[in-house]
C-alpha cells in the first residue's frame, strides 16, 4: 500500500493506494434468502465478515438470461428489477467470502476484476 501526505494544503489528509478486487453481483430484486431480500442478506453478511465496503444499486431497466426486459416504466410495472451489489476489498478477503456467496445465490452473475483503490482520508470534518 502506498501512502502520502498532501502538501501545501491547510487540511491534513492522507491519500493511500492499493490493489484490490471488485466483485459485481447481479441478482433480481425479488430474490430472497431466509425470508429477507437477498441483497440485504448479502450486505449484512459482508459487513459481519468485515469486508471493506459494499454498495447496492437498483437498476431502472435491464434484461438477463431469459431476455425479458424489466423496467420501472409505469406502463410495465416490474417487481423484479435488476440489483447490482458492488463489493471491493483485498483479494484474500474476497476469496474468503466467495464460498458464502455460492451458498446463497441460486440465480445471478458475479464478475470479478482487479482494481486500483485510491482512498482519501481527511480530518477537516472531525
Regions found by a protein language model. Give the residues of each.
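Positively charged, small/polar-rich N-terminal and surface patches that mediate targeting and assembly
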Residues: 2-126
Amino acid at each position: 500500500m502506498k501512502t502520502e501526505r498532501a502538501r501545501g494544503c491547510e487540511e491534513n489528509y492522507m491519500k493511500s493506494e492499493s490493489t484490490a478486487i471488485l466483485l459485481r453481483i447481479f441478482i433480481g430484486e425479488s430474490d430472497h434468502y431466509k425470508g429477507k431480500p437477498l441483497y440485504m442478506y448479502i450486505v449484512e453478511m459482508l459487513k459481519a465478515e468485515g469486508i471493506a465496503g459494499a454498495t447496492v444499486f437498483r437498476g431502472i431497466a435491464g434484461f438477463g438470461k431469459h431476455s425479458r426486459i424489466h423496467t420501472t416504466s409505469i406502463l410495465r410495472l416490474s417487481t423484479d428489477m435488476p440489483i447490482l451489489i458492488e463489493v471491493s476489498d483485498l483479494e484474500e478477503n474476497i476469496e474468503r467470502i466467495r464460498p458464502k456467496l455460492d451458498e446463497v445465490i441460486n440465480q445471478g452473475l458475479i464478475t470479478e476484476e482487479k482494481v486500483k483503490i485510491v482512498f482519501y482520508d481527511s480530518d477537516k470534518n472531525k
